[in-house]
From Swiss-Prot:
Keyword RNA-binding tagged: yes
Known partners and oligomeric status: Part of the 50S ribosomal subunit.
Biological source species: Escherichia coli (strain K12)
GO cellular component: cytoplasm; cytosol; cytosolic large ribosomal subunit
Recorded name of the encoding gene: rpmB
Pfam families (alphabetical): Ribosomal_L28
Family: Belongs to the bacterial ribosomal protein bL28 family.
Protein name per the record: Large ribosomal subunit protein bL28
């Protein structure tokens, strides 16, 4: 399962760990992903999405029906 938010598209990015001596070693910054069940009133069922914390805020703001319509338009399965 890839580490990508289904709502926002956030994915891991790369950067450096910097020690006190400023040595640089590569690292990954991972998105804050959670599998979360959302109740879709129009379909009378639960939908499980892998979303970041920001994705949950987007769903709270726009509504689950609007977000699912955007996912369908992109051709994503949920």
């Amino acid at each position: 399962m890839s580490r990508v938010c289904q709502v926002t598209g956030k994915r891991p990015v790369t950067g450096n760990n910097r020690s006190h001596a400023l040595n640089a070693t590569k690292r990954r910054f991972l998105p804050n992903l959670h599998s979360h069940r959302f109740w879709v009133e129009s379909e009378k069922r639960f939908v499980t999405l892998r979303v970041s914390a920001k994705g949950m805020r987007v769903i709270d703001k726009k509504g689950i029906d609007t977000v699912l319509a955007e996912l369908r338009a992109r051709g994503e399965k949920y």
